[in-house]
Amino acid sequence: MRNNFSKFTKAFTSMTCFSVILISNNSELAANYLIVNKEEINKNKINLKNTTHLSNDPLLTFDLDKKNGLLIVDNGEKNSEQNVLISEIIIEGWEDHPEGRKLELAAYDSMNINPGSIINNQILKDNLNSIYASGWFSGVKIKSQDGPLGVRLIISVVPNPILKKVKLNPKNTIIPNKFVDDIFTNYYGTTLNLNELQNRINLLKKWYEEKGYSLSRINGPERISEDGVVSLNVDEGIVSDIELRFLGSDGEPNVDGKPRKGKTKDWVIKRELKTIPGSIFNRKILEADIKRLYATSLFDDVKVSLGPDNSNPGNVIIILDLSEQRTGNLTGGLGYSNSSGIFAQIGLQETNALGRAWSTNINLNFGEHSTTYNFSLSDPWIKGDKHKTSFRTNVFLSRDYPQEFRSENNGRIYAVNDTTTASTDSLSSIVLEKTGGGFSFSRPLNGGDPFKDSKWRVLAGMNFKSVKMIDSDGKKKPYGDKTPTTGNINEIICIGYTPKDGSCPSENTLVSFIGSTSRNNLNNKINPTSGNKFSLGSEQFVSMGNNSPTFNRMRATYAFFIPTKLINLTKGCKSSDVANIDCPQTIGFEFKAGTILGELPPYEAFCMGGPSSVRGWSSCDLSVSKSFVEATAEYRFPVWRMISGALFADFGSDLGSQDDVPGKPGKLLQKSGSGYSLGGGIGVKTPIGPLRLDIASKDLSGDWRYTLGVGWKF
C-alpha cells in the first residue's frame, strides 16, 4: 500500500496542472479583475518563485502561461493528459459575503468533478471555466495540496458584490431613466451576476435598436465598485455634420476637381431633415427625412452614406448625394369641361424658383365659355418658420360665361342694356370680366414641430376682385333677360349686386376675408379606403362702396370610408386578409352643406350639378341657390390589374333657397332644385388618381350623362 501511494505521489509531482490556476474575466462585462497583482502579469510568463502569495504551494518550479484569458501552470512538459485522483474539494472566499452560502453552492454546482474523480489538466480547466461562466465571481484561484489519500483542491473565489445601482455614462443619455430603473430595480440588493447583467444590458440594447438608434453601443461595465455600483458607458452615435453633394448626369459630385454646385439652396434641403448635427443618429428618423426630400419633388434620387469623424471618434458624418430633377415645365393641350366647353391650355411652371422651392405658374386657358390668364406663386414653407407655414398668392384676368345664367334644356339669360327691351336687341350672352388676386397663409397645427404628422390644418387669407357685367363684344350690360325681345320687365334681372337704392351697377367690387380648418385622417390621399376627412370654411365679404356687397358664405364637408370585401374579382381580394393593400375596396360616404348670409350677387350663389356634385346633371344645372345639402354613397372595387370600378348614388337639394337668390336665375331657368342620380364608373390607375369615366342617371328618367375626369369625386 505504501509503495502504491509513493507511486501516486511521484506521478502527482510530475503533473503540470495542480500548482496554481487563476481565472480572469474574459467577458466584455469584466471589471478586469485578476487575483494576481498587475505587476505580476505584465508579462506572458510569470515564475512562481517570485510570487510570494503562492509560496506555500509544494510545486514551485512551474511557469504561469496566460492564454485566452486563463492563467494555467506549465512546466514545459507535455504531461497534461496524466490522470490524478481528487480526494477533497474545498471552496473558500465566500464566507464574508451576505449571500455566501448561495455562492458556495453555485460554485459546487458549476463543477462536474467530485472527490474521488480522476481528472487531468484539461478537465480541471473546463471546470474552472464553468465556475467563472456561472457569472457569480470576478476571480477564481485554485491551489493543490498533496494529501495521504490524493490531491486536495482548494478553490478560492472572489464573489461579485451586492448590486446597488447601475449608472449610465454620460448621464444625459436619451434612454429614459424610468426604463433603466424598471429593468434593474428588482435586481438590486442581490449578488451581481455577470450573465444576468448581460441579459439586462441586452434589453437596453434592444430598446435602442427598436427605436432606430442603430449606431448606439453599450460598453462595460467600465468598472464594478466594491459597494456594488456598476457603470456602463453608452456611445449613442452622435451626428457631427451633414454634407450635401450634388451629382451630375454622370453621377459625379465634382467638376474639374471642385464640388458641383446645386440649384437648390442648402437650407431648403436641411430644413426637411429632422436629423441635425449634434443629434443622435436614428435610422428611422433618417428614413423619414429622405421621404420628405422626395416629397418636395426636387430630386430624382437621394443616396445616403455614413463616414467617420476623425476629429471626434465615435461620431459620424452623414453624406447625402442628391440628383436634382428638372423643375421647369411647359405644358399645353386641348380638353373639354362642362364649365368651359372645348378649351385649349398652355402653361409654364417652375417648382424650384430661385432654388427656394417656390412654385410659380403662368397659365393661359382659352375656352368656348371661358378665357383665363392666371399667375400664381407659392412658398411651401416660409423660411425660418417652425410651424411650417406656407404662402400662396395669385393674380388673374378672366372672361367667362357664368353657368348660373345657363341651362342645358331651358335656354339661358341674355345680357341687355337696361330694363327696356325691344325686338331689335341682339341676343348677347352674359359675360363676366373678373380682375383680381388674393393671398393666403396655411399651416398644420403641429405645435411648432415641423416634423410632426398633424391631421389638422388651418388657412387664412384675403381675396380681391372687380367684376364687370358685359357682353361678348365688351359692352356694359348689367341686366339679364331670358327673352329679351318680349319686353316683359318682370323677367329682367340685375346680373350683379343690387344696392339698397335699387340700382344695378355694371361693375362690382368684392373684397373678402377667408378662413378654414380641415382634418385629414385618410389612409391614402389619392385612393383612400379607410379613415375620414372634414373641412369647414367661411368667406366674409366686406363692402367697399355702393357697388360692393356684404355677405358671408359658409361651407362644410365630411367624408368617411369603410373598408370592405364584397366583390372578389382580383387575386388580392381573394385573400383572407381584409386589410390587404392589394385589394383597395371600400364604401365611402360624403356629406356637404353650405349657406350664404346677406345680400349677394347672383353669380356668387351655390351651384349644384356636375362631376363634383350630383352627377346626373351638367354643371350648375340642378340649382342656383343660397343654401344646399348634398350626399353621396360610393362603392369602389378593383376589377383587373390597374382597372377599378365604382357604383354610386348622389343626392342634392337647395332646401327651397333658389327663391332667395336675387333675380332668381335658377327659377327663371326652371332648374329642379333637388334631385338624385344613380350610376357607375370605371377608372384606370394613374399616379395622380384614376382616369375616371362615370355614367349617371337623372332621377331614373332614362336621361344619362357621361363625365370624364381625373381622380375620385372625394
Segments (PLM) and residue ranges:
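Small/polar, glycine/serine/threonine/aspartate-rich low-complexity segments that form flexible
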Residues: G328-S340, S657-S674
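Periplasmic polypeptide-binding modules associated with outer-membrane biogenesis and secretion
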Residues: R2-N4, A30-N338, I342, G347, ...
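Gram-negative/organellar outer-membrane beta-barrel architecture
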Residues: N169, T173-D181, K205, R217, ...
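C-terminal outer-membrane beta-barrel translocator/porin domains of Gram-negative envelope proteins
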Residues: K475-S657, P662-K664
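Short beta-strands and strand-coil junctions in structured, solvent-facing domains, enriched
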Residues: H97, G116, S138, I162, ...
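Classical Sec-dependent N-terminal signal peptides that target proteins to the secretory pathway
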Residues: R2, S6-N32
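C-terminal beta-signal and terminal closure region of outer-membrane beta-barrel proteins
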Residues: D660-F714
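Hydrophobic, well-ordered secondary-structure elements that form the walls
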Residues: L348, L377, Y558, F591, ...
